[in-house]
C-alpha cells in the first residue's frame, strides 16, 4: 500500500532540535535502502514529506511512531494508488462501457 505522509513538526525552535533532527536522514535512508520509503524530501521552512510502500496500516503506524520519536510532529497521511493500477482500472472502465 502506498501512502504520502506530510509532517508538520511541533512549534519548538528548530535550533533546539537540530541535533535530534540530524538523525532523521540516516533513519529514513534505512527505509529507502529497503524500498519501504520510495521518496523523502524536506519541506521549505519546516517538515518533510515521504512516500511509503508498506504492507498495511500497522507497518505505517510503526514507522510514524518511530518518526515522531525523532521529530515530534503532526502527520497528514494520504493513501495513494500506483499509476499502473490506475491505468488498468481506467482501461477496465472503458472496456465495460463499450459492452
Regions found by a protein language model. Give the residues of each.
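Conserved, structured core segments of small domains
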Residues: 1-99
Amino acid at each position: 500500500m502506498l501512502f504520502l505522509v506530510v509532517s508538520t513538526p511541533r512549534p519548538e525552535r528548530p535550533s533546539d532540535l537540530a541535533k535530534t533532527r540530524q538523525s532523521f536522514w540516516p533513519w529514513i535512508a534505512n527505509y529507502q535502502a529497503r524500498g519501504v520509503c520510495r521518496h523523502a524530501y524536506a519541506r521549505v521552512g519546516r517538515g518533510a514529506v515521504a512516500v511509503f510502500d508498506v504492507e498495511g496500516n500497522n507497518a505505517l503506524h510503526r514507522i510514524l511512531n518511530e518518526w515522531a520519536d525523532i521529530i515530534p510532529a503532526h502527520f497528514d497521511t494520504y493513501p495513494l494508488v500506483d499509476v499502473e493500477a490506475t491505468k488498468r482500472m481506467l482501461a477496465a472502465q472503458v472496456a465495460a462501457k463499450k459492452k
